[in-house]
Design a protein with these regions (language model features):
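Extended active-site neighborhood of metal-dependent phosphoesterases/phosphodiesterases
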Residues: 1-75, 79, 98-111, 119-160
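Short, solvent-exposed aromatic-acidic interface loops
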Residues: 161-170
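Short, solvent-exposed loop/turn segments at secondary-structure junctions
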Residues: 17, 89-93
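Short, well-ordered beta-to-alpha junction loops that form the rim of enzyme active sites
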Residues: 48, 83-87, 116
């Protein structure tokens, strides 16, 4: 009905009781980690958390191997956009997994899009946009107005974003 592909990102409340925390989510929406290309942009959907309400069956080493392998296969001319439930674990976008590190900026990271904090916020950190978005049904935990965020990523890797606000009053 929206005329576009919809992709999902697992959140902390999607880890529910079952065989393992993300079992129900995976049975409905598919894998919790995946990537795809559109033009010269490589999109990566990750779950870097180890669960929340219920424990994940994947460990940090699983995540590290998958992400490193995925990014190592990306053409060096492509830009990368990360989707994750929470913000980057580090302000410099260098992910540490034990003694190993993965510098996402060396893989042409241009945006990190997340939602866990339930507020609408955009900032630029050394050329990487941090884009946080609240739930569309109730606004933000910071009392921001309800709405949806549109993110446009152009063929030239330009990123623009704007909010469409609406009233929840009946």
């Amino acid at each position: 009905t929206m005329g576009c592909t919809v992709r999902y990102v697992i959140g902390n409340h999607d880890y529910v009781k079952g065989k393992y925390g993300e079992a129900l989510y995976e049975s409905i929406y598919g894998p919790v980690w995946y990537s795809f290309d559109v033009g010269n942009i490589h999109y990566v959907v990750t779950s870097l958390q180890t669960g929340s309400d219920f424990k994940s069956c994947y460990n940090k080493n699983d995540r590290w191997k998958w992400l490193k392998n995925d990014l190592d296969k990306v053409d060096s001319n492509k830009k990368v956009v990360m989707f994750n439930h929470t913000k980057s674990p580090s302000d410099d976008f260098v992910l540490s997994f034990g003694k190993d590190e993965l510098d996402l900026k060396k893989h042409n990271l241009i945006a990190w899009i997340y939602g866990h904090y339930h507020y609408n916020y955009v900032s630029d950190t050394d050329g990487v946009l941090n884009i946080s978005t609240a739930r569309p049904d109730c606004g933000g935990i910071d009392s921001s107005v309800a709405g949806v965020r549109l993110v446009h990523i152009g063929a030239d890797a330009s990123v623009s974003t704007n909010m469409i606000y609406y009233s929840l009053a009946s």
